[in-house]
C-alpha cells in the first residue's frame, strides 16, 4: 500500500511539473495551404529559424510547436517546389500564437509559374517522403486522380518494390519487396484491414476504389508504434478531414472491352465536404460504383514425367492435360466513406468509416483433354460471389497540461467472402483419343475423337462458401516532447494496443454423385427433350447445348483451338446456362450432401496484446535518431474437424467416417527492437538507415487442427497448430537527393527470415504411427535462414527548367532488382535394391527463390500538361516469379515448388502499357480518356522443364477504353 501511495504521489508531482512548464511556456500553431487551390499542404517543414526546433504539418496541413520559452522568433515555412516564407512572431508565457501560411509555387528562371495537377501531385509525394521519420514511398491524391488504375492494387504497384498478383486481368493483391501478400499488412489510417482470403492472411485490394483515397503510403521500415506483423512492409490508405468551405466533385465514365466486343462498362463517384459551427465540425462523405468486364480466354496445361529420364539423366516431360477456358465475368464494385471531425480547444475527435464491396458474376466454360486418363471433359460453372470490407474508427488527439500528447482509438472492422452459389456441371467422353498422341498440345487436339454420342453427364455440384473475419481494436499512445537547449529536441512515446479477431470458415456442398444420369433414367424421369443413350443409360451432353456460339474464341492467339464440342474445326454450340439451372430445379431430390468439405470448416480466435516504448532525438537539425522496442503476445484458439473419407474410383469422396471435433490453442510472445537513423547531409540530400525486427503469423488454415485420413487413397493431410511465427531482421539504407526539380533516391535492403513455413509431403514409415504407410501432407517451419536482397532506384522529376512548351513534362520512373534464397522441405524415399527391399524416408531441403519474388520491376510514367490539356503514358514491367497458387482447394495444401528445380512453376514476365488523356473545359469540368492494357498482353505461366520452359497457361483479357467527365465545385 505504501509503494502504491508513493507511486501516486510521484505521478502527481510529475504532472504538476508538466502543468507548471505548460504555463510558463508558449506555442505556435496553424495550417499551411496551397495558394493555387486552397488545399492543405501535408508534410511541409515548419521551423524556428536559428534553432533545430521545428515540426512537419500533418495530413491536413496543421502544425504545432509547443514548449517555446517567451520571446521573439522567426517562423520558417518551406515546401519543395514552393516559395519559402519567413514570419516574425512573439510568444508569451502560457500563450498560443496562431499563424496560417499560404504558399505559392516557386518560379524557375523568370518563367511564368504554371501550377499543374501533375506537378502538385509530385511535389506532395516528394515532401511526404523527404520529411518522413521512416522510409516510405507515397502516391499523392493528385497522382491517384491522374492514373487510369481500376482499383487500389493497381495504384500501389506504381511504387518501387511492389509487384502484383493478378486475377481476371487486374491486380488484386500485392507482393512487397519479394514477400508474398500474406507477409504484408494493409491498413486504413493505420487500422488493419481483415483478411479477405479463405486460407491465408492476404487482403484483396481490388475492392477499394481509388476515388475515396487521399493518399497511399508504403512503409518499408516499421516504427515501434506500428503493427509488427509486416515483414514485406505496410500499405496504408489515408483519408483526411474536411477543409474550409463547401467543396465537392463528381465523376462519370463508360467504356468498351475489346475481348468481349461489348460496351456497358461504367464507373461513377461523388464526394462532398464542408465545415460547420465556425469550422469546429467537419464532414466528408463520398461514394462510388463500378461495373467492369473482366472476361478472359486461354488455356492451361499440365505435364507428367512417367517416361523417366533421357540419356543425360534429364526428366522427360509430356503433356498430361490440356484445358481450354472461356470466362465471362462481370464485377460490380460499391464503396462509401464518411469522415466527421470535431475540433476541441486542446485536441480533436474524428470518426471515419470506409466500406467496400465487390460482386462477381461469372460463367466459365471449359474443355478438358485428359490424355493421361484417356477421356475428354466439358464442364460449365456459374459462380456468384460477394466480398465486403467495413472499417469503422473513432480516434482522438488531446494535449494535456500543455506538454503531453495523448491519442487513442477504438475500431471495429470486418471482412466477408461469400459465394452463395457455385454450380458446376461436368460431362465426360471415355476412350476419347484415337491413338496415344505424342503429347504436345497440337497432337492431343488432333487425336481427340470429339464424339458427342459418347459424351454424357457425369455429375453436378452446388457449393456455397462463407468466410467472415471480425476485428475489434483498442489502443492508446502517450507522447512527451522535450527540448535540450535550442539545438536538441525529441520525444519519448509509449502505448498499448489490444486486438481481438474472430474468424469463421464454412463450406457446404450438394452434389448428384457420379452417374446421376443413370439414376434418372432408371427412375424413368428423364426429360423427353433430352438426347439419351438407353443402352449405356447415358444422358448426353447434347441435351444441354444451346444456340450460343463462341466463334471468336482464340482470335488473339497464334494457335486456333476450339471451345465448343463437336468433330469439326469450329466452335460449336455451348452449354446453355438456363438448361443447367432447369436441371437444378427439376432434379433437386437427386442432390445429396457431400460431407468431405466439412473438413474445411473452422472457427478461429486470435487475440494480440501489444505494447511499445520509443524515443526520438534530433541533433542540430542534422541527425534524427529513433530507437524503441515493441512487444506482441499472440493467443490463438482454433476449432475444426477430423475425419476419414471413403472415395470412389475417381478419388471423389463419397462419405465420411469417424468425424470428431478438434481444438487447438497457442500462446506466443515476441520482442521486436527497431532503430532508425536519418542524416541530413545538406539542404538537398539525406541518408537514412534502419534496422528493424518484424514478424508474420502463419496462414489461418495452416494453424487449424483439421485432419483427413484417406486409407483408400493412402494419404493424410493435417494442419499444425504449433507452427512457429516467422520473424525477420530487416536492414535498409536509402540516399535521397531532392530539390525544385524533383527527387532521386538510391536504396538497398536485406532481410533475414526465420521459420518461414512451407508444405511438406512425405511417407510415414514409423510402425508406431497411426497413419503408418500413408503419405502425409502438412505445413512445417523450414530449416535455414531465408534471405532477400534488393536494390531500388526512384526518380520523380519535372522539366520546369526548360522553356515553354517543354516545361510541362513530368517524369516518374523506378527500378527494383531482387534476389532471394529460401529452403523448401522435400521428402525423398530410398528403397534398398536387395532383399528385404526396405524403404526409408529422407526429409531434406532444396534451395530456391521465394514464391512471388520478382527478379526485376520497372515502372515508367511520362506526363505532359499545358493550358488545360494533359496526357500520361505509363508502363509496368514485371519479371518472372515462382507461381503462387491463389486457387488452391480448401483442405489441399498445395505449393508451386517441385521436388526438383525442373518441376518449379513460374509466372511469366509481362509488360503493360496504359494511357490517359485529359482536357479541361472551363474551370470546373474535365473530359478524360483512359486506355488500359494497350497491347493486350498475354499473361502466361511456365514449368521450368529440363531444357526449356514449358507453357502451362496462356490467357488474354483484352484492351479496355473508358471515356468520362469530372466535375469539381
Enumerate the language-model features and the residues they cover.
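Short acidic/polar hinge/loop motifs at secondary-structure boundaries
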Residues: 66-67, 192-220
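C-terminal beta-signal and adjacent terminal beta-strands/loops
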Residues: 877-893, 918-969
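N-terminal periplasmic accessory domains that precede
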Residues: 97-102, 152-155, 172-175, 187, ...
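Transmembrane beta-barrel wall of Gram-negative outer-membrane proteins
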Residues: 27, 261-364, 381-395, 400-401, ...
